[in-house]
Amino acid sequence: MSKINKLEHIRNIGICAHIDAGKTTTTERILYYTGKSHKIGEVHEGGATMDWMEQEQERGITITSAATTCKWQDKVINIIDTPGHVDFTIEVERSLRVLDGAVAVFDGVAGVEPQSETVWRQADKYNVPRMCFVNKMDRMGADFYKCVDMIKDRLGAKSLILQLPIGIEENFKGIINLIKMKAVIWKDESLGAEYFEEDIPTDMQDKAAEYRARLLDMTVELDDTIMERYLSGEEITEEEIKILIRKGTIEAKFYPVLCGSAFKNKGVQPLLDAIVDFLPSPIDIGIVKGIEVSTSEEKDFPISITEPFSALAFKIMNDPFVGSLTFIRIYSGKITSGASVVNTVKNKREKIGRMLLMHANNREDIKEASAGDIVALAGLKDTSTGDTLSDIDTQVVLERMEFPEPVIELAVEPKSTADQEKMGLALSRLAAEDPSFKVSTDHETGQTVIKGMGELHLEIIIDRMRREFKVEANIGAPQVAYRETITTACEIDYTHKKQSGGAGQFARVKIIFEPLKDVIDLKDEDKNKTFVFESKIVGGAVPKEYIPGVEKGLNNIRETGIVAGYPMIDFKATLVDGAFHDVDSSVLAFEIAAKGAFREGMQKGNPKLLEPIMKVEVITPDEYMGDIIGDLNSRRGQIQSMDPRGNAQVVTAYVPLAEMFGYVNTLRSLSQGRAQFSMIFSHYDQVPSQVADIIKAKK
């Protein structure tokens, strides 16, 4: 391995696409033909090597990006197999951040599907060079040319066709290689391991010549000298064509398109050749952006084995045998097991325990790794996804990954109180693995609330809690965090007096209650508060030592409003006058008086129920705009803007959180899964009276 493990010989690639396009099957075939798997795993039999989690084998979908290393010709290929379900886009995003190139797999029947669009946009964000593999050419209804048109129309991508299919559907038997101008036919009886080249069938020669001319027209544009030779009728060599295709792919001038049927073992070896020939090595990427810790300056750092060590942690995974594994992509320098490095994001030293090369869920211990490698480290204590590991003497922080906010939440509780601690540990471990999964405690209900990217995402979290941590949980729908406020100002004069033998109680307070939005002279430090208390007592009408009792009483009682028992927010209470008794007054008496004044003030202040309003952004193809806007309006949404973004539309709206539960599924069905959305908390607003009546009735 070490002899050939030089930067120009490494290909760090991802295989990504929509669910069911055949990514995992394609990866399985790659592992088979590169000699890593002795038998081919079939997804529909639950035996694929890459799909190593139990849930994945049951569902036949890829949930976590398994990393694996294999070898083709004299090149090392590190493959990340990514999930295709929309709930797991974070896994795709994490992978793309550390890859140099990607293979986008398309279903030859369905063409460009919704998740294909999402993944393509994510790859654009990280400027990842990529090629396309039109899979399932043996299936009924497969149409290579239609799929290529969809790549152009839906993704706005300039495709460079390198192969044409020979035969369609069940008669698909091979491809035409437009670079060599030869037909490649696979022998079925050898599981696709054997294939032979022959002349292009007579009935396809004209079409092959037409597409070969297109290929040359697009590639020679990249080199003026070769273009002049081409225009003067000179023959361009196969090697020159390959160099131009590589240049155009790395610069994203176009995207090479290949075809085949991974399941039927046709087209995989030419795909491997293309990965090696056209996708970039770490040297082609050249630099990585980061910040030099000593100067706080942003710089471009060269990707090189001779530079000081730097790496990005892009995934944390719990391994049943090794414990916590941190997957890293090394950008510069080298590292040995047992070495000490620094986590520059957390400013903590880490000691490398075991260092592993991963093959799905099998592992191989290694002693050293260097720039370009993707390896798993055991024994790290403080490193989380997105952190930088760096040389202790020359510290850098690499560009961080961005993670979307979760959009769906559920309340969970253990089925037995004995499991409470175990559940807390399980959830914190799972949250450490997955930045798009968050855990919080609702301070009002005491419930543990889990948040994720979709219902399937949370289902799998709960399933993993049960299988890996042996914690059974009850799940429920979370409650919306309603609030209450007053809408008009009022002045309350309240006296608390108690005389019934023994020490008496006496306190009088005069308090002005007013909505915060109406306060003209609000101090800067109070502008982000939901409750403000001020004392304007002069002349000792209420002694200084009793005033904290007034504030404490108001703070305690405002947790339970009078409309439906929700906390009161967005109001100011000003203590303007009062009276006390030398013997009977106390802090407690003024606390009780303040509570009495609050109850009266809230009644007179025209109280209203408030609800959280979310800022919702929907990205959708044009054709679904009408349905999506109609649906948002029916959810009491207020449309703020509609703007074009690339070949999609972005709708921004403010929608009550109570109306957004289950929206992810509605949006999928409205847009056939092609639209995506994000939402963040914006503000609290009044609940319409007819809705408020329903909420009060439920309390």
From Swiss-Prot:
Q: List, alphabetically, the GO terms of the cellular component aspect.
A: cytoplasm
Which domain of life does this protein belong to?
Bacteria
SMART domains (alphabetical): EFG_C, EFG_IV
Q: Does the keyword Metal-binding apply?
A: no
Keyword Cytoplasm on entry: yes
Q: Which InterPro entries match?
A: EF-G-like_DII (IPR053905), EFG_II (IPR041095), EFG_III (IPR009022), EFG_III/V (IPR035647), EFG_IV (IPR047872), EFG_V (IPR035649), EFG_V-like (IPR000640), G_TR_CS (IPR031157)
UniProt xrefs under Gene3D superfamilies: 3.30.230.10, 3.30.70.240, Elongation Factor G (Translational Gtpase), domain 3, P-loop containing nucleotide triphosphate hydrolases, Translation factors
Its job: Catalyzes the GTP-dependent ribosomal translocation step during translation elongation. During this step, the ribosome changes from the pre-translocational (PRE) to the post-translocational (POST) state as the newly formed A-site-bound peptidyl-tRNA and P-site-bound deacylated tRNA move to the P and E sites, respectively. Catalyzes the coordinated movement of the two tRNA molecules, the mRNA and conformational changes in the ribosome.
Q: Which family does it belong to?
A: Belongs to the TRAFAC class translation factor GTPase superfamily. Classic translation factor GTPase family. EF-G/EF-2 subfamily.
Query: Can you say what this protein is called?
Result: Elongation factor G
Instruction: Name the species this protein comes from.
Output: Rickettsia typhi (strain ATCC VR-144 / Wilmington)
Chain's gene name: fusA
